[in-house]
Amino acid sequence: MADHPAYIELKGICKSFGPVVANHNINLSVEKGEIHALLGENGSGKSTLMNMLSGIYSPDAGEIYLDGKAVSFSEPAESIKAGIGMVHQHFKLVDVLSAKENIVAGKEKAGFFIKQKQLTEEIRAIEEKYGLIVDPDKKVYNMSVSEKQTVEILKVLYRGANILILDEPTAVLTPQEITKLFD
């Protein structure tokens, strides 16, 4: 048994929607650096569980711990502030904006004007760190599905996520795009 708390710990998590029980008494521990996959049939509660961790839903019962401290998120902005980023199965990108514009949209920055060169450098640093490369000036409507997925991942990393939740990351990808995404 470890002498330190798990980085993420879910204890006794329950969530219902009316009479439908989505999660009942779920326990999960994740250490730093670990990769976990939740497998189950459609409607088995996987996305609901991750939506609670990312602040979209609140559990009806149970507790969530992050690095040993109890946390409660009432909205996604709170979970991203805590370092949890979620990439959803259905992209949340603006088609007429570039990759760079989508990555930084909604991110609070000091000052009124955002320096484009600085943004490009910040995004490039994240791309190089994680090996996720995308043309920052390419419009989303001209991107492949895997490029859009990459932009979504870069978006949460740009916001400071150190916990990355991918909800069905390969559901809309071709076999070639899956290989590229996880390469």
Task: Report the location of each language-model feature.
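Glycine-rich phosphate-binding loops of nucleotide-dependent enzymes
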Residues: 2-183
